[in-house]
């Protein structure tokens, strides 16, 4: 299984942002640093969140503004794609929809074609929402979303792109037909350690997941956080040890 690192955790702990501006994380310069690290330490891919336009403002409520082919002005996709390839690494795309699936479906063909053109072999999709009914009045696990997920993985397969879905629907065996549906989240993830009011996931959280969530199929949990303390968030920390973070690469896949 491929391992990847990415530009995401630094936003959750508050040292950078998805939105554009002085603290924007997904810049050409910062992404090159991650690519260099990945190449040096044997990681296959580099996930980049916040690379595209639409993150400024209240994106959870305004997800219809996301553009999945237009990069932010300080993110040079062609340059970074070529740079990653020269280092033996590939960029992993990020398509956060905030649950606005109609907006995503209108752009998917162009978005996946762009990814294939630039050698982006995988995409992390996202459907962040608050509550079971989304802004478009549809249920997260309703038929509209079931149909949508099938469209995504089918179109991605045509462009030879692997899908890792966050805020997904339940795994029901689609990956037997579409093996590019590599993994999905579907559990309380690592990011809760950065900002949850209850202080983060309890130490036994990851011991339970393989025997509960893991029963339905592969799980994307984003392990590998070694800076356990979070100076920017004194009431939070990653409730773990370094050995445990490494072990999660084996016990959760």
What are these regions (language model features)?
Residues 229-253:
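Glycine-rich, aromatic-lined ligand/substrate-binding cores of catalytic
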Residues 1-87, 95:
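Conserved structural scaffold segments of CAZyme catalytic domains across common CAZy folds
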Residues 2, 175, 218, 244-245:
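Alpha-helix initiation and N-capping motif
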Residues 4-6, 220, 250:
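Generic structural signal for residues positioned in beta-strands
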Residues 14-26, 137-139, 230-238:
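Low-complexity, polar-biased intrinsically disordered regions enriched in Pro/Ser/Thr/Gly
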Residues 50-231:
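Aromatic- and carboxylate-enriched substrate-binding clefts and catalytic-loop regions
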């Amino acid at each position: 299984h491929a391992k990847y690192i990415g530009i995401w955790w630094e936003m959750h702990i508050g040292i950078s942002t998805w939105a554009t501006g002085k603290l924007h994380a997904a810049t050409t310069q910062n992404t090159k640093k991650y690519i260099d690290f990945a190449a040096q330490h044997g990681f296959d891919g580099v996930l980049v969140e916040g690379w595209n336009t639409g993150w400024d403002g209240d994106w959870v409520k305004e997800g219809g503004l996301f553009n999945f082919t237009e990069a932010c002005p300080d993110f040079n996709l062609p340059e970074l794609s070529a740079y990653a390839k020269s280092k033996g690494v590939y960029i992993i795309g990020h398509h956060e929809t905030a649950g606005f699936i109609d907006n995503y479906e209108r752009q998917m063909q162009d978005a996946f074609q762009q990814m294939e053109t630039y050698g982006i072999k995988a995409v992390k999709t996202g459907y962040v929402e608050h509550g079971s009914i989304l802004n478009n009045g549809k249920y997260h696990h309703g038929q509209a979303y079931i149909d949508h997920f099938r469209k995504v993985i089918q179109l991605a397969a045509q462009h030879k792109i692997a899908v890792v879905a966050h805020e997904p629907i339940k795994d029901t065996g689609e990956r037997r037909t579409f093996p590019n549906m590599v993994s999905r989240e579907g559990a309380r993830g690592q990011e809760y350690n950065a900002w949850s009011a209850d202080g983060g996931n309890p130490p036994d959280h990851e011991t339970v997941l393989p025997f509960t969530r893991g029963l339905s199929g592969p799980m994307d949990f984003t392990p590998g956080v070694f800076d356990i303390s979070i100076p920017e968030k004194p009431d939070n920390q990653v409730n773990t040890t370094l050995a445990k973070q490494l072990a999660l690469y084996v016990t959760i896949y």
